[in-house]
Amino acid sequence: MFSSDELRENYLKFFEEKGHKRIASSSLIPHNDPTLLLTTAGMVQFKPYYLGVAKPENPRMASCQKCFRTTDIESVGDASHLTMFEMLGNFSIGNYFKKEAIAWAWEYVTQRLNIPAERLWITVYLDDDEAIALWKEQGVPENRIVRLGAADNFWGPAGDSGPCGPCSEIHYDFGQETGCGKADCNPSCKCGRFCEIWNLVFVQFNQDKSGKRQNLPAPSIDTGMGLERLTILMQSKKNVYETDIFAPIVEKACLLSGRKYGCDAATDRALRIVSEHSRGITFLIADGVIPDKAGRGYVLRRLLRRAVLFGRRLGLERPFLVDMAGAVINRMSGIYPELKKRQTYVLEMIASEEARFSETLATGLELLEEIVRQTKGGRISGQDAFKLYDTYGFPVEMTTEIAAEKGLSVDLDGFESEMEIQRTKARSSRKFSFDAAATAEAVKNMRHAEKTCFVGYELAIQKSTIKDILTEGGTVDSIEEGDEASIVLDESPFYAEMGGQVGDTGEIITDAGRFEVKNTLHLPNGVFLHQGRVINGCLKISEAATAHINEERRRDIARNHTATHILQTALREVLGEQVQQRGSVVTPDRLRFDFSHLKPMSKDEMRRVEEFVNDKIRRNLPVYAEEMPYRHALEEGVTALFGEKYGDRVRVLRVGRPAVSAELCGGTHVTASGEIALFKIMSESSVGAGLRRIEAVTGREAEAFINLQQDSLSELSGMLESTAEESPRKLAELKEEIDTLKKAVQNLERQMSRGEAEELLSKAEDYKGVKLLVSRMTSVNADTLRETADFLRDKLGSGVIVLGTVTEDKPFFLCMVTPDLIAKGYHAGNIVKKLSQIAGGGGGGKPNMAQGGGRDKSKLDEALQAVKGMI
């Protein structure tokens, strides 16, 4: 019996013998291919070869590729569906075609794997007579060759565009005793009798985004055989979880949960989900995916949270996914060494994300149960689904899955409406300077909708023509002094806000007027809006104008933008290749860069990043841009942002020869890195789970920042009467002395309050059969007040204690109720809530202890006097 590792090696060796070059698996994150969410097939890394934009070292290649598909996540848990899998494949780039592909496939399955030929059926595309003839040459009888349509036997593209073509599949027949039992049953039947084991794709076309197909430069071959499915067959197992691929991982899940696999369907399903998703998230994180609200990160978050949910159903209340990931790494790192190399990072990321979700899971499940109880009409509202998503971190797919188990559906349209409301709010800070709805209406009626020609890469001043003028009221023919408006030019040197870079400012001048441009916006139709106000005179539509940007401001922006590119390279150099850009803002004053990283950067890491960037600045590296076909840029390894939409031609910005940085970028930059002058990090902070932010300055702003720090240090040194070098030590000594004095003061306060508390005991009175102690205390903080109340409660044994004080110039209340009186209905939280309301504030708490405050300290005594009315 073959092990899965032996099958993998056996396949690759077979095709090496056929002249193929063994190629290592690429990452699950497609290399510079924003058209794909994740790597879905073995041919993804070879797309440039199929498209003819690059040439492989050897036109024959074979690989075992990590793949990930997201279409059936909710189905994972049955016996067949997987998210992450390994795809065995052999590939020809214009070298061999159908004849060799079919002959070698048949040879491998019948001679190397020794699968009986009579157990194998073939499917082909409807009109592929050539393939049918070639299968017959291998000895396959015509009655075991089935013609099927495009849904079954036309493959690709992998994404919304790319190589594709008809295909032919090899199916294994489990026999008539399996499945429907019909005499005419064939691989098109879904009864379970047949299992597809190998797909041979005859790559002939390139399909564009509109669905149009063109012939490729040379017909090629792309085959795919799922290792997991093949292993099931070769090890005679019922499903993949019983094979040696998953058995150790399932065993770990059983060990952690105390459950046994194979006892009942619900337990088996949960064990499969935990095991499969643990494998998937381990590989995703190792390849650089981080949890997020969108894109690849959302897929990862869905899997991780679904695994946690089903872990709870197995009784796993404590974090367990780190242990599961460890089992995955132990099983798979021999084949994929990156798992061991990035083990610490992977486990830290999983621990962090699992802990975050665990904090809200229990409360979220309680809320969901309540929603289920109250739901009428069999449908959970979009509002409720959104609350579970936004507040408790429940992916809507998870809510839908749980609801389905209860016989309910979810209003997904309503959920999407709530999401759009949230997105609109998030965009509100970026709206036009005048009413967005009015602007949208004006844009719709714009008289000039042709794209603005941007000339700002080369020019700071440009002769132009005013094509349109927009105001809050719509389009107008002219504007006068003091009017606020947006001007549309046919040609403009102004960079419009895009890609994180702010828009240019400057002036638009005509013979009759001067317009101050305060911002430049880029509309979806490619038109630039030059927003601002008329300084003097008037401006009219169709007038000749001179557009002049603020050149000094542009140079400052360029320094920061180029520095941002070098910074990204520096972060990957210092922190690791898993670092990904998550956002950036480039202004004249500073730059802001958000990136994926689990923990705060150390001082040493920040220093090394600064040193890297400043070294590249001192080298005065050339900074240059060139336009090229998008596909060529990807082949050259240029960094592209996932989710960004790029045209057929792109602008590549490089720093250095050879390039230190190469990114797709439409922004403005310096011509040599030396123009940046100086780079200085101002701060490094967290902006979310697994997300860090660096704010930095360059040039004059960096000098000003350093001078400010030096001035502050000099002032501090003077106050401490020490040198700059000695100041940190002296400040630490001073802080230690202050902490010691604070503790002494607190001890003294406790002694005084204890004495005061002894006196307060005498003020306790019987009121309606209850011991009641109400008092105002002076010169105590909230902590001391709580200690005093604890002392009084213990001394009284039974009673209600209400204390008040003024702390930080605001009233503060604390109430304690002994257990015997709680049983009689007395509630500390209710009492404090009423007291706080009298003082203009709020508060509450548990029946035994509660605290709260107000805004009006003059109401403190009035509130305390009202206590008896609350008893």
From Swiss-Prot:
| One example GO MF annotation | alanine-tRNA ligase activity
- The question of whether Nucleotide-binding is a record keyword is answered with yes
Q: Which cofactor does it need?
A: Zn(2+)
- Cofactor binding note from Swiss-Prot or TrEMBL: Binds 1 zinc ion per subunit.
Main location, first listed in the record: cytoplasm
Q: What is catalyzed by this enzyme?
A: tRNA(Ala) + L-alanine + ATP = L-alanyl-tRNA(Ala) + AMP + diphosphate
Question: CDD domains per the record?
Answer: AlaRS_core
Which residues are involved in binding Zn(2+)?
H561, H565, C665, H669
> What keywords does the record list, in alphabetical order?
Aminoacyl-tRNA synthetase, ATP-binding, Cytoplasm, Ligase, Metal-binding, Nucleotide-binding, Protein biosynthesis, RNA-binding, tRNA-binding, Zinc
Family, per the entry? Belongs to the class-II aminoacyl-tRNA synthetase family.
What's the entry's take on its domains? Answer: Consists of three domains; the N-terminal catalytic domain, the editing domain and the C-terminal C-Ala domain. The editing domain removes incorrectly charged amino acids, while the C-Ala domain, along with tRNA(Ala), serves as a bridge to cooperatively bring together the editing and aminoacylation centers thus stimulating deacylation of misacylated tRNAs.
Task: Extract the HAMAP family matched here.
Answer: Ala_tRNA_synth_B
Q: What's this protein's name? A: Alanine--tRNA ligase
Please give the organism.
Dehalococcoides mccartyi (strain ATCC BAA-2100 / JCM 16839 / KCTC 5957 / BAV1)
